């Protein structure tokens, strides 16, 4: 909370950003959440006043219910997303592949996914999981190679959301 206060509140930065949005120089004002749940909850508690246009959160099928196992500062994406939905704030999704880890699964898990959708990449499952939620505005993806871009285009054009069974299968990976 102290960093938020010193960087954005006490020095008038947030007020400045709000005025810039009001003047039309900022179209969409939001924030990217990284770790301190007190800051997240505080900023959302002020949504009626601040009118966030979006919030960027980390969401993938590991972080959905097991974020603290990845990093003790993290908060489960299920909670973060639910809080955004309550306030009708669109979500921008970062880390849908958990830093690439969800594109490189062990052979057993990969086989289970390939059995269901043989033509799809393992990465596409993580992207489809993140894109399944109705209040997701966009899913960010870091791409290194042309084949990553092509796979992403196949996955998102058009996006086929996970079925309930596929959603559950993704969550089984974390069990």
Indicate where each model-derived feature is located.
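C-terminal active-site-proximal or functional interface alpha/beta core segments in diverse enzymes
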Residues: 121
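Histidine/acidic-residue-rich catalytic or RNA/ligand-binding cores of hydrolases
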Residues: 101-110, 150-156
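Short, glycine/charged-rich beta-strand-loop motifs at protein surfaces that mediate ligand recognition
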Residues: 113-116, 138
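N-terminal pre-core extensions flanking Radical SAM catalytic domains
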Residues: 130-168
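Glycine/proline-rich, positively charged
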Residues: 1-93, 97, 105-109, 117-118, ...
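Conserved small/polar residues in nucleotide/adenosyl-binding loops
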Residues: 173-174
